[in-house]
Amino acid sequence: MKKILLVFVCSLFAFETVLAQEKNAVGLRLGDGVEFLYQCDLSSRNFLQFTLATPHFEGLSVTGIYNWRCCRWNWTPQTCDWYLNVGVGGALGLYDFDDSGFLLGVAGSCAFGCHFKNAPISLEVDYRPVVGAVIGGGHDGFFDPGFWNFGLSVKFHF
């Protein structure tokens, strides 16, 4: 377990070092585990989001989601801009460190949040289901726990 944790931490730093050269966002998501995320703007209407996660604290997965910025509201013009983003993508990873099952699935995203005007920070409440198959390690079958993936995110934009 210590070796896996060390590999995870080293991978995280390497992942963030490579991606930090872009001028977009990095963040942390708490929900169905812990996720480190990177957001890469493609245009003013869409972006890619990549996460490195520990689903159910039982494995390690990578998710990529193509998102659309579908709605914007100016409910609190002095403090923040409110938004709704939706997206679709895929996930793969290891499920259950002890038995090494492989996870392959489809991911979705629906995020409601606010981007603060006076600080490069945004907060989100989201639903990000991952539905697919777990193969090997005695866990062959449908990955249904990923269907209940609600979370809170904080992002730092740069």
Language-model features and meaning:
Residues 4-15:
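Sec-dependent N-terminal signal peptides
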Residues 22-24, 30-34, 58-62, 82, ...:
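Residues that define the transmembrane beta-barrel architecture of outer-membrane proteins
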Residues 15-21:
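Sec/Tat signal peptide C-region and signal peptidase I cleavage site
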Residues 23, 96-98, 136-141:
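Extracellular loop and loop/strand-boundary signature of outer-membrane beta-barrel proteins
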